[in-house]
Amino acid sequence: MGRKKKIIEEVEFTPSKYQINIFEQMQHGVGNIVIEAAAGSGKTSTLIKALKLIPSDKKILFCAFNKDIVKELQKKIGKVENVDIRTVHSLGYLMVQRNLGTSQLAINENKYRAHILNNLKYYTDLNLWSLGKVQYLKYIDNICKLIDFCRYNLADTEKQALELVYRHDIDLIGDEINIALEVMKWGMENTDEVDYTDMVWLPNILYMKPLGLQYDFIFGDEAQDFSIAQRELLLKCQKMGSRYIFAGDKNQSIN
């Protein structure tokens, strides 16, 4: 009872029995914590309250799925010196920036599509003139989709790409898989510009180092939506004894 009372005092509200279990594991347990609960059950609030239980000399990363959630978290948590609140993409951007030794990275969401449109004839033996306008645009879209899906899933073989084709019901016209894999090689070598998927893909595929982005505690909100590339990026941020506290709802997963 004494331990429960102390937790209530520290988190400054009366938690449910489930939250008490989480908070006790935070303070007295070891290893990682996964909180699975339905939408509206207070997962994010539980994570925020859990921050109060961590000593101020511990470095904390709190990752959210998008910028709007980050802004909300910043309002609720306030400015706490040892807590770094950001999206996973923002984390990846910073890691790429530091590893490439540049003060600013140019962001171009059209990086891959523009390259494909300008260089497609060098990647394919297909007679592009034989494709009608609708088929041609679908062909381009298929390549771009595959490049995105492959990067998010850290897929770099034909077999892995084909699995993604089936999973996402992509109706192939011809050699889209081969082109996607080749364009990804170009993307690895051309890092003057990055798109948002590059931010979480490049740190993994180029074996980048965390360079100051290592934390004692790593929180992940809406963790069911993290892609393989995003999860692997977060794993780069651990150090000896780091703990991961993830919250999510598998029934809401978009991946």
Residue ranges and their predicted role:
Residues G2-E24, N32-I35, T46, L126-F219, ...:
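Accessory N-terminal region flanking or inserted into the helicase ATPase core
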Residues G92, T102-S130, G241-S253:
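Conserved phosphoryl-transfer catalytic core
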Residues G92-M95, P203, S227, I254-N255:
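Activation segment
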Residues E36-L47, D57, F65-D68, R86, ...:
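Conserved helicase motor core of SF1/SF2 NTP-dependent helicases
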Residues G2-S103:
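P-loop NTPase Walker
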Residues L53-I54, K76, R98-N99, N119, ...:
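Active-site catalytic microenvironments for nucleophilic, acid-base chemistry
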